[in-house]
Amino acid sequence: MKAKDIVLKKSEEIEGLAIEGPWLDEVESLEGVISYYEKIGFQATHLGKAVKIWRKVEEKRKGGEEVRVFLGYTSNIVSSGLREIIAWLVKERKVDVIVTTAGGIEEDFIKTLKPFILGDWEVNDAELREKGINRIGNIFVPNDRYIEFEKYMVPFFERILDIERKLKRPLTASEFIYEMGRYMDEVLGKEKEKSIIYWAYKRDVPIFCPAITDGSIGDMLYFFKEERHDSKLVIDIANDIVKLNNLAITAKETASIILGGSLPKHAIINANLFRGGTDYAIYISTAVPWDGSLSGAPPSEGVSWGKIKAKADYVEIWADATLVFPILVWMVMKA
């Protein structure tokens, strides 16, 4: 075979979407640019597909069809400015079930007291420790936020104890968080109106947190119980798994939107295993699959477990959620 025949090998014709980006003289808005994403290629295409999937879910819901939307996110999502976007989604009844970590609860509450501050990645962390400043990436959290948080948690724990005495049973973590929303409604001012927990309480959206003690809430519980050795305060996580699984089982269809990985991701897709898998899935993550971690497992791996239906409409965007989630929400809800 001649070298030219090898290099210029004849190809078969294929059909598909032509790769194309926006011609900037022809688009008049960022929305117009983003409308090209599906045709750009690489992760832009994945973001474009995510827009289509979520729009399909929204159209069904607006048409009266039941698609129960599960939203999962790790605590760093709430550390960032994505917190307000999630709170808006809850306020507007765009999500039905939330699963997060302890940080996703406590940081939402703390931000109603004092803000987190934009810092830098390249700093002397030992000096920050001396100053009592905690760092989450390039976000700084002075420790007085946690001191203030404890001032609110002590009377809140007392309230939970009273409720549990009256009910003669422990509250589940989701009930604990619901009562936190009620507490915020009573003791906080206007600042609560950008809180996820507050709007979940107002809209009756359950927030599940299977690892509720794995954070500052756990620290506060430790201090509370150590200082009151007779304290009977208990949080029940066993009954929450029944409630979460049943929310998946009883839905006609489900959509799972997951920011990051870890416990929230698995809690949602595992609940959907009980119904034969979720129907729609959007993952946004920077985790990689080759270490076998759940955080890095792509949707297709979930299919092998029965947690995502084989015929489900799904996509994973490998990107920092702070970059793409605002675009995704805007394109689905506002464009």
UniProtKB/Swiss-Prot annotation:
Q: What reaction does this catalyse?
A: [eIF5A protein]-L-lysine + spermidine = [eIF5A protein]-deoxyhypusine + propane-1,3-diamine
Read off the InterPro entries from this record. Answer: Deoxyhypus_synthase_arc, Deoxyhypusine_synthase, Deoxyhypusine_synthase_sf, DHS-like_NAD/FAD-binding_dom
The cofactors it requires, by name, are: NAD(+)
What is the organism field in this record? Answer: Pyrococcus abyssi (strain GE5 / Orsay)
**Official protein name in the record:** Probable deoxyhypusine synthase
Catalytic positions are K307 (nucleophile)
Highest taxon in the source lineage: Archaea
Name of the top EC class for this enzyme: transferase
- Chain's role: Catalyzes the NAD-dependent oxidative cleavage of spermidine and the subsequent transfer of the butylamine moiety of spermidine to the epsilon-amino group of a specific lysine residue of the eIF-5A precursor protein to form the intermediate deoxyhypusine residue.
Gene Ontology MF terms: deoxyhypusine synthase activity
The EC number(s) attached to this protein equal 2.5.1.46
Q: Which UniProt keywords apply?
A: Hypusine biosynthesis, NAD, Transferase
Provide the Gene Ontology terms for cellular component: cytoplasm
